[in-house]
Amino acid sequence: MNENLFASFAAPTILGLPAAVLIILFPPLLVPTSKHLINNRLITTQQWLIQLTSKQMMTMHSTKGRTWSLMLVSLIIFITTTNLLGLLPHSFTPTTQLSMNLAMAIPLWAGAVVMGFRFKTKNALAHFLPQGTPTPLIPMLVIIETISLLIQPMALAVRLTANITAGHLLMHLIGSATLALSTINLPYALIIFTILILLTILEIAVALIQAYVFTLLVSLYLHDNT
């Protein structure tokens, strides 16, 4: 019997209870904190990566916007570890669920927009009408800019969901082909297995890049509204 390609994206259960909550809370365990005065190599590397990421995203922010650095660093660590855990065999990737990605994107986007309208009302309203717009095009441009603003959280969530899901499906298909050919033609199976290894390396890069892109776009939304 052929396994459903999307079976790996179904939320698992433990004793009839959804295990998504436990899976989502698991990534923080992979980022340990040191209790010693002198850190080991793992903690030092972890802190260096966090500082590098924070500096990269906070350079364009004002002093007020830099208060969000802890939230942005926590966000990129969470998405990165969740994506990487999903590459393990027979595991579940929460970021393949559009509902979870929307639950991350909508509050962050809404918070940035509300801050913009509260503290930078004129600048926020000015985004709806570019300077020098011909008078007959004003109503149409206002509608277009409003729609583009409202679809920002959907674009954030769909981008992350689509990229992670597509990679997992491709790995599943190539892995199934490798198993099928292993009993028919071993040389071809080894070639496809090599392709699977290369694809796995590519998916690790995609997991890191998508976490960075998601967090960077949230940072840009905050920059435009703070």
UniProtKB/Swiss-Prot annotation:
Membrane topology: Multi-pass membrane protein
One Gene Ontology molecular-function label: proton channel activity
Subcellular localization: Mitochondrion inner membrane
GO biological process, one term: proton motive force-driven mitochondrial ATP synthesis
InterPro entries associated with the record: ATP_synth_F0_asu, ATP_synth_F0_asu_AS, ATP_synth_F0_asu_bact/mt, F0_ATP_A_sf
Transmembrane segments: 6-26, 68-88, 97-117, 138-158, 164-184, 189-209
Gene Ontology CC terms: mitochondrial inner membrane; proton-transporting ATP synthase complex
Principal subcellular localization: mitochondrion
Keyword terms, alphabetized: ATP synthesis, CF(0), Hydrogen ion transport, Ion transport, Membrane, Mitochondrion, Mitochondrion inner membrane, Transmembrane, Transmembrane helix, Transport
Reaction catalysis annotation: H(+)(in) = H(+)(out)
Keyword Cell membrane annotated: no
Pfam families in UniProt: ATP-synt_A (PF00119)
Subunit structure of this chain's protein: Component of the ATP synthase complex composed at least of ATP5F1A/subunit alpha, ATP5F1B/subunit beta, ATP5MC1/subunit c (homooctomer), MT-ATP6/subunit a, MT-ATP8/subunit 8, ATP5ME/subunit e, ATP5MF/subunit f, ATP5MG/subunit g, ATP5MK/subunit k, ATP5MJ/subunit j, ATP5F1C/subunit gamma, ATP5F1D/subunit delta, ATP5F1E/subunit epsilon, ATP5PF/subunit F6, ATP5PB/subunit b, ATP5PD/subunit d, ATP5PO/subunit OSCP.
Function: Subunit a, of the mitochondrial membrane ATP synthase complex (F(1)F(0) ATP synthase or Complex V) that produces ATP from ADP in the presence of a proton gradient across the membrane which is generated by electron transport complexes of the respiratory chain. ATP synthase complex consist of a soluble F(1) head domain - the catalytic core - and a membrane F(1) domain - the membrane proton channel. These two domains are linked by a central stalk rotating inside the F(1) region and a stationary peripheral stalk.
Family: Belongs to the ATPase A chain family.
Annotated protein name in UniProt: ATP synthase F(0) complex subunit a
Organism: Pan troglodytes
